[in-house]
């Protein structure tokens, strides 16, 4: 690879934060400062990103018991016909 830093992840605005004011003091919490010479904007990258681990294990979800609706319709759901009835009042979707 060449000496240029790989900044493909900065193409989305959600990953980019503009620097304003005195950048010397505001850069202490950031690892890399990237400056786009053509536009003059500066982007900051955080020291570490925190990711939440999402379980993709489907078997855990399948073993959970289904919760029954309290006060719900007995039998088949009326939504399969495109309407809902509650205490004699019908609502169409």
From Swiss-Prot:
InterPro entries given in the database record: RPE1, SDHF4
Domain RPE1 insert per the UniProt entry, residue ranges: 8-55
Region of interest (Disordered), residue spans: 1-24
Family membership: Belongs to the SDHAF4 family.
Name of the molecule in the record: UPF0369 protein RC0209
Species annotation: Rickettsia conorii (strain ATCC VR-613 / Malish 7)
Record lineage: Bacteria, Pseudomonadati, Pseudomonadota, Alphaproteobacteria, Rickettsiales
């Amino acid at each position: 690879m060449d000496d240029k830093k790989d900044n493909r992840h900065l193409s989305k605005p959600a990953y980019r934060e503009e620097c304003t004011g005195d950048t010397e003091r505001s850069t202490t919490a950031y690892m890399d400062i990237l400056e786009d010479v053509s536009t003059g904007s500066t982007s900051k990258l955080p020291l570490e990103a925190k990711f939440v681990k999402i379980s993709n294990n489907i078997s855990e979800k399948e073993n959970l018991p289904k919760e029954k609706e309290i006060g719900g319709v007995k039998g088949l759901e009326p939504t399969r016909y495109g309407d809902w009835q509650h205490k004699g009042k019908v609502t169409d979707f």
